[in-house]
Structures are given as structure tokens and as C-alpha cells.
Amino acid sequence: MKAFSPVRSVRKNSLSDHGLGISRSKTPVDDPMSLLYNMNDCYSKLKELVPSIPQNKKVSKMEILQHVIDYILDLQIALDSHPTIVSLHHQRPGQSQASRTPLTTLNTDISILSLQASEFPSELMSNDSKALCG
């Protein structure tokens, strides 16, 4: 028969319980708070990227999403009204028109934004939030 102290409980993960960072890596499913923090990081990143969102005012997540949707629609209108795109829509009859133009320039812009996001100090963005948002 083993004896234990009634004052101290026996724990397998006593080091991780004290916040020493010695624990198995958790997936967002294992740690819902981690997922919440990652989502909050993503909303913060969206707030930074969309120019119509006031930076000095607290806005709800719903407002952020509404601004993001409006911004995407504005970008789509700007893209559709770009002279190169307009000339593609006025092709000679008999030539097939593509319903959409390739997104190569958009993908380049996203790559640039991803590179800018990777320049943030690691204290501000965890690796998990970079994977989800970047």
C-alpha cells in the first residue's frame, strides 16, 4: 500500500499545471481557449488590413465581417473596371470570353500580405495564428 500526503494531490502533469510550458502540444480541439485566441488574432488582423475599419474605435466581430465583405466587393468592382479587364470583355465576336480572369495578381498580393504578417514579432502572433490567418 502506497502512502500519500493528504495535502498534496498526485498529478501527472504537475509541471504543465504551473504554466512552465512543459506539456504536450494541444490541437485547437483539445484547447478551445487556444482556438478562441487564434480567432481573435484573425479578427485583429482583418481589422488592420481593411482600411474602412476605424483603428481607434472598438468594433464588434459582426462589424468587422461587414467591413470585410464591403471591402471585397469594392475590390471586385475596382478589378472589374480596370482597363485591362474592360478590354477583355470587349473582344471581337467569335472569340470565347472567360467568365473570370486569373487571380494571379491577387495571389501575389496575398503572398505579399503573408510576408508582411510574418514580420510581426512572435510575441504578437503565435505560430498557430500565423497558420490560421497568414
Swiss-Prot record:
GO MF terms held by the record: protein dimerization activity; RNA polymerase II-specific DNA-binding transcription factor binding; transcription corepressor activity; transcription regulator inhibitor activity; transmembrane transporter binding
PTM summary: Ubiquitinated in a ASB4-depedent manner, leading to proteasomal degradation. Phosphorylated in vitro by CDK1, PKA and PKC.
Domain bHLH residues, every copy: 23-75
Region (Disordered): 1-24
Record motif Nuclear export signal, residues: 106-115
BP GO terms, sorted: adipose tissue development; adult locomotory behavior; astrocyte differentiation; B cell differentiation; bundle of His development; cell maturation; cell morphogenesis involved in neuron differentiation; cellular response to lithium ion
Keywords: Biological rhythms, Cytoplasm, Developmental protein, Nucleus, Phosphoprotein, Repressor, Transcription, Transcription regulation, Ubl conjugation
Places the protein is found: Cytoplasm; Nucleus
A single cellular component GO annotation: euchromatin
One Pfam short name: HLH
Positions of modified residues (Phosphoserine): 14, 25
Domain of life per record: Eukaryota
Matches recorded under PROSITE patterns: BHLH
Subunit: Interacts with GATA4 and NKX2-5. Interacts with NR0B2. Interacts with CLOCK and BMAL1. Interacts with IFI204. Interacts with NEDD9/HEF1. Interacts with ASB4; this interaction promotes ID2 proteasomal degradation.
Domain observations: The bHLH domain is essential for its repressor activity towards the CLOCK-BMAL1 heterodimer.
Function description: Transcriptional regulator (lacking a basic DNA binding domain) which negatively regulates the basic helix-loop-helix (bHLH) transcription factors by forming heterodimers and inhibiting their DNA binding and transcriptional activity. Implicated in regulating a variety of cellular processes, including cellular growth, senescence, differentiation, apoptosis, angiogenesis, and neoplastic transformation. Inhibits skeletal muscle and cardiac myocyte differentiation. Regulates the circadian clock by repressing the transcriptional activator activity of the CLOCK-BMAL1 heterodimer.
Name of the protein in question: DNA-binding protein inhibitor ID-2
